[in-house]
């Protein structure tokens, strides 16, 4: 009886405390030293802002242990503006409730600008992984970049130069970029929109989307799909198991699309001539006997489209190949 009475009073006390907590201590969104504790980082003011000036084409190097990296072109010549956003998440419960455990760097060496956040020592707090440091950086158009994050997304918009991007699990978005790009993500998607140059991309678990590209595309995927539209240039794809869909406006040096188990569908411009090779579980070629000459059965195709010339190779072990002539 004593045990039952004790449990009864304990339950009543817990309910009272819960009501008091809700009434007297509603959620608080504090603002201290430029940091919002609101869980929505979009509404935050920057924790720190720094500006630099570069003379001519510059180079930007960014690293963060956890958070997003956004690099955006702006119209001010030579100006580089860095905004650092801090989201503490649940870190106020842990040993990392202040920023003393992190080394924040923003500096300039000639025409190179460096922005980084690193841990001074490994924090073992229960919620230490919830703390994120995100960069939003405004740069002139002529700017090469080296962008890395262990746990966030990367976006690059409107710049020209040589670019390297790496994230351990986030997405990578590349818009209106010219030059040479190398992008890698361990688990996210990669997208290209209105790009011009040489584009290398690899994802271990996501898809790759391309919308209007001029130049050379080299794409590698573990199991994701490729969706490519309005391509002018050269394209090489290696996928372990995903589908490949590609529409070409013009073809330069050639096309090679390879997937182990997925399907391939390609739209080729009728004004070009191609040396075409395809192997698949089943092949579908648009019925145009005047443009194709060579050998063809349900699983293999070898011949020319039009007058021939540009090599096109389409290979899948277990999927289908569909070839459309526009």
Segments from the language model and where they lie:
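Intrinsically disordered, low-complexity terminal regions
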Residues: 1-326
């Amino acid at each position: 009886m004593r045990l039952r009475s004790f449990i009864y009073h304990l339950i009543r006390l817990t309910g009272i405390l819960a009501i008091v907590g809700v009434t007297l201590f509603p959620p608080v969104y504090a603002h201290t030293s430029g940091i919002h504790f609101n869980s929505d980082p979009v509404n935050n003011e920057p924790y720190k802002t720094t500006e630099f000036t570069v003379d001519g084409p510059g180079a930007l190097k960014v690293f963060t242990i956890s958070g997003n990296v956004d690099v955006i072109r702006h119209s001010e010549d030579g100006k580089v503006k860095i905004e650092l956003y801090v989201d503490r998440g649940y870190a106020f419960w842990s040993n990392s409730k202040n920023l003393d455990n992190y080394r924040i760097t923003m500096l300039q060496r000639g025409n190179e600008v460096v922005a980084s956040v690193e841990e001074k020592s490994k924090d073992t707090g229960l919620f230490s992984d919830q703390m994120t440091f995100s960069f939003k950086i405004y740069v002139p158009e002529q700017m090469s970049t080296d962008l890395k994050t262990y746990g966030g997304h990367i976006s690059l918009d409107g710049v020209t130069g040589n670019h390297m991007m790496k994230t351990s699990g986030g997405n990578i978005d590349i818009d209106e970029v010219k030059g040479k790009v190398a992008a890698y993500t361990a688990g996210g998607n990669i997208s290209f929109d209105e790009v011009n140059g040489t584009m290398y991309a690899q994802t271990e678990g996501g898809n790759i989307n391309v919308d209007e590209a001029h130049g050379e595309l080299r794409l590698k995927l573990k199991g994701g799909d490729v969706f490519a539209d309005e391509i002018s240039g050269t394209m090489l794809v290696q996928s372990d198991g995903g589908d490949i869909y590609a529409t070409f406006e013009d073809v330069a040096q050639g096309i090679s699309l390879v997937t182990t188990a997925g399907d391939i569908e390609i739209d080729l411009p009728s004004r070009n001539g191609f040396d075409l090779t395809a192997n698949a579980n089943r092949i579908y070629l648009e019925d145009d006997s005047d443009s194709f000459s060579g050998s063809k059965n349900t699983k293999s195709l070898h011949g020319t489209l039009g007058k021939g010339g540009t090599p096109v190779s389409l290979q899948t072990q277990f999927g289908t190949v569909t070839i459309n002539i526009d």
